[in-house]
A protein has these predicted regions:
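Internal active-site segments that recognize and position negatively charged phosphoryl groups
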Residues: 158-173
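Short hydrophobic alpha-helical runs that function as membrane-insertion/retention elements
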Residues: 66-67, 89-92, 161, 181-186
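Conserved nucleotide-binding/hydrolysis micro-motifs of P-loop NTPases
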Residues: 72-75, 95-100, 165-168, 188-192, ...
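Short Gly/Thr/Asp-enriched flexible loops that form oxyanion-binding sites at enzyme active sites
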Residues: 77-84, 170-178
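Short glycine-/polar-rich loops that comprise or flank the Walker A/P-loop
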Residues: 63-64, 87-88, 155-158, 178-181, ...
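Active-site rim loops that border cofactor/substrate pockets in soluble metabolic enzymes
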Residues: 117-159
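Short glycine/threonine-rich loop/turn motifs
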Residues: 171-173, 178-205
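N-terminal cationic and glycine-rich segments that engage phosphates or anionic surfaces
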Residues: 1-65, 71-120, 130-135, 153
């Protein structure tokens, strides 16, 4: 792993949330409080990051995908960049309830969106009547927000990688229900006990 504790320090990963937002379950990863801010223990962050990296490598070596999830504004760019670098599916818009627990229905809708995209590419959409085209375009616009990052999703993922497990509580709950491992950046306002591989750190840095 080509990251050092100093790298984490320089990135501000040690800055947690204000004490009034502190989740007591994050206590094992907080070593101090300064000026009303929780300070995260970067030695523990480093060790858990290393463990999480190994877990991801193992999942990928089995031919499984890792679904990258980060729907808050600060998470969108890093999630998109990570998805582009790894060719993994991602979600940066609103998490659709049932993405995992109602995967069959979601897969059907995703297949429909893919068929619309093919029609647009091969020109068959242009051969349809105006009202039909307008209706399909409206559907595509709605679907684009939900499915743009899932076009290469091959099935139920082998794991979730999440930025801000507190914000993505629904996605985490669905994964836990299906016993899908969750690797997540967890700030001092979050509950690390619901995660397979918590990585304590500033989820806004």
């Amino acid at each position: 792993m080509n990251i050092t504790v100093k790298d984490l320090l320089d990135a501000g990963v040690h800055f947690g949330h204000q004490l009034r937002r502190w989740n007591p379950k994050s206590k094992p990863y907080v070593f101090d409080n300064r000026h009303g801010i929780s300070i995260i223990d970067l030695e523990k962050t480093y060790d858990l990051l290393e463990n999480a990296s190994k877990a991801i490598e193992e999942i990928i070596s089995q031919g499984k995908q890792v679904l990258l999830v980060g729907t808050k504004r600060q998470a969108e760019e890093p999630i998109r960049e990570l998805a582009a670098a790894t060719n993994m599916p991602f979600c940066v818009n609103r998490w659709m309830g049932g993405t995992l627990t109602n995967f069959e229905t979601v897969s059907t809708s995703l297949a429909k969106y893919k068929s619309f995209l093919r029609m647009e590419e091969d020109g068959s959409l242009d051969k349809m009547h105006g009202k039909e085209v307008a209706a399909i375009k409206r559907q595509m616009s709605r679907m684009q927000r939900n499915f743009e990052g899932l076009l290469n999703l091959q099935g139920i993922p082998g794991a979730l990688f999440v930025i801000d497990s507190h914000n993505e509580a629904i996605a985490v709950a669905e994964a836990n229900r299906l016993k899908i491992p969750v690797i997540a950046l967890v700030d001092s306002n979050s509950d690390p006990s619901v995660l397979s591989h918590p990585i304590p750190g500033n989820d806004d840095s």
